[in-house]
Amino acid sequence: MAESGSGAGSGSSSVGGVSNPTSLAPGDSQLIALIVEQLKSRGQFDGFRRDCLADVDTKPAYQNLRQKVDNFVSTHLDKQEWNADMNKNQLRNGLRQSVIQSGMLEAGVDRIISQVVDPKLNHIFRPQIEKAIQEYLAAQTKEEPAPPLPPGPPEPQEQEPPGPSQSVS
């Protein structure tokens, strides 16, 4: 019973409290988190990643970025005077910072995304995501008990017919 208070390790405690995801508005952060978790649990993100990685090294943007980074690293290391007392970690961290500050990674990755991910987005990824969302919401609708029917129009109450009028003649 000690586990009942620890929701941090489960990963779903922040979105698990939603009783009816179909009632959430499109774009709601809880709904998005639920859908992302569903895609992850189905392994679809891994599939997207594998699909992109299988294609990335054939694209000119990747080859160009790799060549730029190789040249940058070679130039940087050529400027260093090697000795046995050098701290390799400091050298590595300095090189990493120089590469990041150069801006070449950010620009290169943007080009890679436009060559690898963007073409797959509408034709491959979006249909799979939409299908997963529809299946998820359909399953959630089936799991939820049907909401009670709204009350119909009030039934007319039976009234006793008016008794014979007792008119005084």
Curated annotation (Swiss-Prot):
KW Transport (keyword) present: no
One Pfam match: COMPASS-Shg1
Segments of this protein annotated with the region Disordered: 1-23, 136-169
Compositional bias (Gly residues): 1-10
Keywords: Cell cycle, Cell division, Centromere, Chromosome, Cytoplasm, Cytoskeleton, Kinetochore, Mitosis
Pro residues: bias regions: 146-169
Any single Gene Ontology cellular-component annotation: cytoplasm
Single biological process term from Gene Ontology: cell division
Subcellular location as annotated: Cytoplasm, Cytoskeleton, Microtubule organizing center, Centrosome; Chromosome, Centromere, Kinetochore
InterPro entries from the UniProt entry: BOD1/SHG1_dom, BOD1L1
Protein family (similarity comment): Belongs to the BOD1 family.
Its job: Required for proper chromosome biorientation through the detection or correction of syntelic attachments in mitotic spindles.
Protein name (database record): Biorientation of chromosomes in cell division protein 1
